[in-house]
Amino acid sequence: MTDDELPKTVFDDLFSVIESRRETLPDDSYTASLFAHEKGENAALEKLGEEATETILAAKDSDSAAIQAESADLIYHLFVVLAMEEITLDDLREELHGRL
């Protein structure tokens, strides 16, 4: 798939799916399992830390494919934590825009 074919809304689409899983908690969903985990938010925070470390290690090794894959995992788990805290992508956009 070329860059021109990729949807520009992929982050919004992903965040929507995460929010939907938070609301419906389907049994077969990894995302829902993070929201329903017995350790609560700590489970998602641990995964976020793990993915951050894996991203750093991939960058240290200059492994482009691993950097891409680990960054996707990092963003996904960050979005889960944002959803847990009821922080929207618009909130994040506003924060980033204020830093320009």
Swiss-Prot record:
Q: What is its main location?
A: cytoplasm
One MF annotation (Gene Ontology) recorded for this entry: ATP binding
Q: Name one GO biological process term.
A: L-histidine biosynthetic process
Q: Which reaction does it catalyse?
A: 1-(5-phospho-beta-D-ribosyl)-ATP + H2O = 1-(5-phospho-beta-D-ribosyl)-5'-AMP + diphosphate + H(+)
Query: Which keywords does the record carry?
Result: Amino-acid biosynthesis, ATP-binding, Cytoplasm, Histidine biosynthesis, Hydrolase, Nucleotide-binding
- Stated EC number for the protein is 3.6.1.31
Compartment(s): Cytoplasm
The UniProt entry, under Pfam families, shows: PRA-PH (PF01503)
Task: Give GO cellular component annotations, separated by semicolons.
Answer: cytoplasm
Pathway(s): Amino-acid biosynthesis; L-histidine biosynthesis; L-histidine from 5-phospho-alpha-D-ribose 1-diphosphate: step 2/9
User: Which CDD domains does the entry mention?
Assistant: NTP-PPase_HisIE_like
Q: Which family does it belong to?
A: Belongs to the PRA-PH family.
Record protein name field: Phosphoribosyl-ATP pyrophosphatase
